[in-house]
């Protein structure tokens, strides 16, 4: 009996899956792909125009953090004490509480959508946010496990609050505000 031998010859070179790779001809030289390079002159000019426009709409940097802070955000950052007063007090509009962190990517995306909702529902809903790094005990008491977490609280004290966790579409937030609160 003869044994059959199979050999495989790839027809195309292997795909490059990384932003950089090592050259087999020169093992110590690192080659960059087209997508990983940004012209330093272009990068510097883009940063300077972005920085100038940001500085023109922001107040001077906060002494503690050194960051520029916009003053015209509709969604205001509040403390745990402020939230407790808002919940206990009488409201004519629903209250939406966003538990977020500054380092959380989905929280940043959600903040943009909440700003759009705040413009859309300016007089029909109150939207506030709580930084879980600053108010970690309050976040723990509110059972915030994942970020971002939203609480939708109806002005009617007989209705249960609605809790969502994770990034949700803006249309879902509209539906909750319009139909469930």
Curated annotation (Swiss-Prot):
Keywords: Chloroplast, Disulfide bond, Electron transport, Oxidoreductase, Plastid, Redox-active center, Transit peptide, Transport. One of its GO terms (cellular component) is chloroplast. The record marks 105-106 as: Contributes to redox potential value. Residues 72-181 form the Thioredoxin domain. It is an enzyme of class 1 (oxidoreductase). The keyword Transport applies. Residues 1-70 form a transit peptide. GO terms for molecular function: protein-disulfide reductase activity. PANTHER family: THIOREDOXIN-LIKE PROTEIN CITRX, CHLOROPLASTIC. Probable thiol-disulfide oxidoreductase that may play a role in proper chloroplast development. Belongs to the thioredoxin family. Plant CITRX-type subfamily. This is Thioredoxin-like protein CITRX2, chloroplastic. It comes from Nicotiana benthamiana. The lineage of its organism: Eukaryota, Viridiplantae, Streptophyta, Embryophyta, Tracheophyta. The gene is CITRX2.
């Amino acid at each position: 009996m003869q044994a059959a031998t199979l050999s495989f010859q790839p027809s195309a070179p292997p795909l490059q899956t990384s932003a950089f790779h090592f050259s087999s001809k020169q093992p110590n030289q690192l080659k960059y792909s087209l997508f990983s390079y940004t012209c330093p002159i272009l990068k510097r000019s883009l940063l300077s125009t972005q920085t100038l426009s940001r500085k023109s709409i922001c107040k001077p940097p906060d002494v503690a953090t050194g960051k520029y802070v916009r003053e015209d955000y509709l969604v205001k950052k509040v403390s745990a004490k402020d939230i407790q007063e808002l919940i206990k007090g009488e409201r004519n509009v629903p209250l939406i509480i966003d538990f977020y962190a500054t380092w959380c990517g989905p929280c940043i995306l959600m903040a943009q959508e909440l700003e759009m909702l705040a413009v859309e529902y300016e007089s029909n809903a109150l939207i506030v946010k709580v930084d879980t790094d600053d108010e970690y005990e309050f976040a723990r008491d509110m059972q915030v496990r994942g970020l971002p977490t939203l609480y939708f609280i109806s002005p009617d004290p007989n209705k249960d609050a609605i809790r969502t966790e994770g990034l949700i579409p803006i249309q879902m937030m509209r539906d909750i505000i319009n139909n469930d609160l």
